[in-house]
Regions:
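N-terminal Lys/Arg-rich, disordered targeting/topogenic segments
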Residues: 1-10
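Sec/Tat signal peptide C-region and signal peptidase I cleavage site
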Residues: 36-42
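Cleaved targeting-peptide boundary
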Residues: 42-51
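Catalytic glycan-binding domains that act on GlcNAc-containing polysaccharides
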Residues: 44, 64-224
């Protein structure tokens, strides 16, 4: 499969702020089916200074148009993607009833994850913890959307339009680019990167919630 990391996304996209676990959150990780209003619980994340070169690179990563349909090198790789899409759609059905909305969401998660060099199961687990898959979730400190992007990211590397963070692809683009940024800062240490994302760097609670939720979205293709 060919995937251009610089490929366009949504022009309104901006980098993502770190997350706050949703109140219904990760209790869904451990099997509790809480369903609360569009409020998410924030971690004590801090806005960090960015070097000009880093800010420029992050801004370039988010400033694209809608993602193209993926192009696969082989029929088998395309079939593998479609099998993944079908399985994830089945798992997500209880949370997102509308088929078209569900498939569009999963296609975008897959694209943005791969574009940022992340595993889709990790991103889905993070979304489960951050917002419980609620598009309009808002934390007590103002983090927004599926991946609980902090508004300051729109100012730092986007066009400043914080309402755009409720746009599905914009939010997912920001979230994936920001998590990738934290992974790079932490030299690939996912535990520490997740802590940065939540504003609780070095503490185990949030990373462990995401690791637990990720298991709900792990996918093993069927044996040939």
């Amino acid at each position: 499969m060919k995937l251009d990391r610089s490929a366009p996304v949504d022009a309104s996209i901006s980098c993502k702020g770190r997350g706050r676990r949703a109140l219904l959150l990760g209790l869904s990780c451990i099997g509790a089916g809480l369903l609360l209003p569009n409020v998410a619980l924030a971690g004590a994340q801090k806005e960090e200074p960015l070097a000009d070169a880093v800010r420029t690179a992050l801004a370039a990563s988010i400033a694209n148009s809608a993602p193209p349909k993926p192009v696969f090198d082989t029929t088998e790789s395309r079939l593998a993607y479609l099998r993944w899409l079908g399985e994830m759609s089945t798992r997500l059905k209880k949370r997102t009833a509308d088929h078209t909305t569900r498939v569009e969401f999963l296609e975008t998660v897959w694209y943005e994850s791969k574009r940022a060099g992340l595993d889709p199961s990790l991103v889905l687990g993070l979304i489960q913890v951050e917002s419980g898959f609620r598009k309009y979730a808002i934390s007590s400190v103002g983090a927004r959307g599926y991946m609980q992007v902090m508004p300051f990211w729109a100012r730092l590397i986007g066009g400043g339009d914080t309402l755009a963070l409720f746009h599905m692809q914009t939010n997912l683009r920001f979230g994936c680019v920001i998590l990738r940024h934290y992974l790079d800062i932490e030299r690939g240490d996912l535990f520490m990167a997740l802590g940065r994302y939540n504003g609780s760097r070095g503490r185990p609670e949030y990373p462990n919630l995401v690791f637990g939720a990720r298991k709900n979205w792990d996918y093993q293709p069927p044996a040939p």
